[in-house]
């Protein structure tokens, strides 16, 4: 029997994930103590072929040894996959504030911030066993469901999906990255006033970086490193490999290099998704600022219009 265990930080999207799996045909069980899983799976295996089980902090044993023992017992008889959902601290705080729900560990008289930090410490042993760590910080419910469907399709096809992403260190390291490469030591187009407004996807920035031997050497050596270990990673029953390339702001160097690496592996016939996290983040910020500006201008126009009409009437 195939068993998908959904766990992760409270507020990271476990309920959404479980509903998405239910929609794809999995028999779903929410929040059962881990110690009862062997008995539950024995019963379900008589009538079900695919089961998804959600575990939260309240149902995971305190002992890392007990956790490992229970998972080992299950893996002897079933195909187990563990999906761990993650999100950054600020996002979790905002989600709890929006939902007005209590964090499970808040019952221990902890503040929300302290409860979030304490929960992560409890969950660390489970993270070590995860087949997929999914950062939901910037994912909508629909995007999360789609990533899970991609993961499940990857399981059935036994095909490794490669995600190459650029990011800015000033915004934080992506939590779902398997490999992180720091390119902040490479020549920076930011210091050229003509290149500063551009991104690593634009030709002048690409030409600038391509003209430096150290940039080309870094790309070559990174490609060689991944090429060397990719066959073993593919044999290791993984569904995703996330490679993160970081520079200071995630605008020039990391974008160019991530694009080069992604296109290289695409040309080799691999399934590759290229994404630029900081560029996408800045687009959302600009879009939000534009909407707010338009809203403010509309409000000012309406106010001026009313004031004009009032002045004309009273004149």
Swiss-Prot record:
Q: Please tell me whether the keyword GTP-binding is annotated for this protein.
A: yes
Keyword terms, alphabetized: ATP-binding, GTP-binding, Nucleotide-binding
Question: Does Magnesium appear among the keywords?
Answer: no
Q: Which family does it belong to?
A: Belongs to the RapZ-like family.
Q: What is this protein called?
A: Nucleotide-binding protein CGSHiEE_06315
* Natural source organism: Haemophilus influenzae (strain PittEE)
Please give the superkingdom of this protein's source.
Answer: Bacteria
Q: Could you read off the lineage of the organism from its UniProt record? A: Bacteria, Pseudomonadati, Pseudomonadota, Gammaproteobacteria, Pasteurellales
Annotated HAMAP family: RapZ_like
Instruction: Check the record and name the Gene3D superfamilies matching this protein.
Output: P-loop containing nucleotide triphosphate hydrolases (3.40.50.300)
Per the record, a Pfam family?
PapZ_C
Which residues make up the binding site for GTP?
Answer: 56-59
- Database matches in SUPFAM superfamilies: P-loop containing nucleoside triphosphate hydrolases
The entry lists its GO molecular-function terms as: ATP binding; GTP binding
Q: What does this protein do?
A: Displays ATPase and GTPase activities.
Q: Which residues bind ATP?
A: 8-15
